[in-house]
Amino acid sequence: MTQVPILRPSEDVSVDQDELARIYIQMDCAADDMVAQAIEELALRLPHAETLYQQSLPGDLAACAASISTIAARLGMTTLARVAGDVTACCASGDPAALAATLSRMIRLGEGSLREIWDLQDLPI
């Protein structure tokens, strides 16, 4: 009998610590609130994007992915921001395989980026 390999996709995530430092320098006391709110928004929008995909709502998914891209860019999550932009493009392309793969990658990156920024900010998960 042939064994079927089990794939466990993983993503290398990174948060641009210089970008986070810039936020804290520019915003001073308000930075904690802004970063916490942005983290919360990402934590809500990532599963919402998955729901929109399952409901076959590509227009709404594109808007959700665009907002994820904007939030991620503000927090220095450059790879997540780029891949969320790719999800937006896939919604317009009409290629269901590309959309499924890219959305899955965005979710993996998003979850990993949130874990990393929580560690950097010393926030409980």
Residue positions per predicted region:
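Two-component system phosphorelay core
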Residues: 1-63, 67-74, 78-125
